[in-house]
């Protein structure tokens, strides 16, 4: 309820937007009760820090930077939605390039194995790549699930995300989620 009438910036149609709508719903508010401004993560952080918006939808290193700069976390999304990242190809691409898709999945599997077996080096590589310290990468690591297996909970989350997109006018037609998962 404390967000009523506030300006909130973040990326529309993303998991962060979905978290915002879920969080507002817990306080008996709707998106219309706030002024939502579509913007990327770095822009949202800059707008919040400059006072142009009251709150920002942030994730990963950008969220960590905001917290370290004194921002207060209103919600981390827990209990509102599951953060899910999928890799997708078109049915046509899959039919025309099955070996390439298999190779991609194998490389992904090998990368996850490397992370598990070379954790310290993974922290170092990631820190250098994203401009964080190893300690900051370690702090963010538990927020990510690198398991490529598509679980029933993942399918349910995709269904819920689709409902969110339809309800908010970002997807026109409902699709059968199970029919688009390659097994």
Report each predicted region and the residues it spans.
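A generic structural-conservation signal
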Residues: 12, 33, 57, 75, ...
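Bilobed "Venus flytrap"/periplasmic-binding protein-like clamshell domains
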Residues: 1-65, 120, 160
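Pocket-lining segment of extracytoplasmic ligand-binding domains
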Residues: 36-37, 42-127
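Conserved C-terminal helix/tail region of periplasmic/extracytoplasmic solute-binding proteins
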Residues: 163-183
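Secondary-structure end/capping motifs
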Residues: 95-170
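Phosphate-coordinating loops and pocket residues in cytosolic domains that bind phosphorylated ligands
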Residues: 5, 68, 182
């Amino acid at each position: 309820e404390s967000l009523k009438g506030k300006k909130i910036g973040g990326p529309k149609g993303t998991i962060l937007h979905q978290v915002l709508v879920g969080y507002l719903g817990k306080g008996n508010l709707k998106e219309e009760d706030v002024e939502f401004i579509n913007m990327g993560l770095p822009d949202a952080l800059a707008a919040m820090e400059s006072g142009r918006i009251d709150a920002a939808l942030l994730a990963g290193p950008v969220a960590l930077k905001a917290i370290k700069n004194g921002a207060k976390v209103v919600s981390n999304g827990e209990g509102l939605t599951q953060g899910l990242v999928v890799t997708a190809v078109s049915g046509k691409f899959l039919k025309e390039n099955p070996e390439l898709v298999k190779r991609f999945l194998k490389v992904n599997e090998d990368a996850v194995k490397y992370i598990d077996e070379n954790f310290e080096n993974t922290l170092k590589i990631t820190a250098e790549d994203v401009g964080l310290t190893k300690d900051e990468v370690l702090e963010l690591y538990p927020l990510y699930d690198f398991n490529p297996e598509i679980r029933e909970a993942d399918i349910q989350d995709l269904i819920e995300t689709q409902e969110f997109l339809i309800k908010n006018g970002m997807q026109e037609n409902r699709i059968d989620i199970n029919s688009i998962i390659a097994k």
